[in-house]
Amino acid sequence: MSEIQVETKGFHCVDNAVVYDLTESMIAAGYPMRTNTKDLLTTSIEGKDIDRAISLSKATLKGNQAHDQFLSGIRIAFDLRCSNKMWVEAERYRFLTFVSSQSTMHRITKFDLSDQYNKYVDSSIIAIMKQKVAAYNYLLEKDDTNPETLKEKYLEILYSNPAGFELTARMTTNYRCLKNIYKQRKDHRLPEWREFCSWIETLPFAHELILCDA
């Protein structure tokens, strides 16, 4: 199985990225035209394999949506940091899968809030959130605090938290899903979607297989 470490330097939203099975999946794109079983055992990619894979991926531009199925075999895992606003939209992609993520439900009162909000969150709102967290933690340390009061205060914090709060999650997906994301989000209003799409452009064979502009 091929494994490629992907550069993420210069991108705020992505880290620790690895691409798997790029070579194997590009070779497999030619399976429908092969009749000799021994031909399927090769792990050495040739120019004709690359050309066919690129041609099949570009065929979707003409409406042949099934021809790029092999892209689903090119898997990629990465850490994604983005706002609650972007996470809500990211969850619509069926094949963009959460491995694990940070949690406001469990740890909202433990975060350093100064590092968690993007630049679009009003500083006065951040100050209010810090006050609410400080008040909760103060009550938590007191022996005589009513448990129901703590529950209510915690819910106040959860529901008051603005959309610009950023969380990091380990994600896994494939090139076919990224192709769909890129098409739909490259000019999105949210800058973090645009940054993510800019990072997609740097992936191995991205221009040939995802953007289809090469």
Feature map (PLM): residue ranges:
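Family-specific signature for flavin-dependent thymidylate synthase
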Residues: 1-214
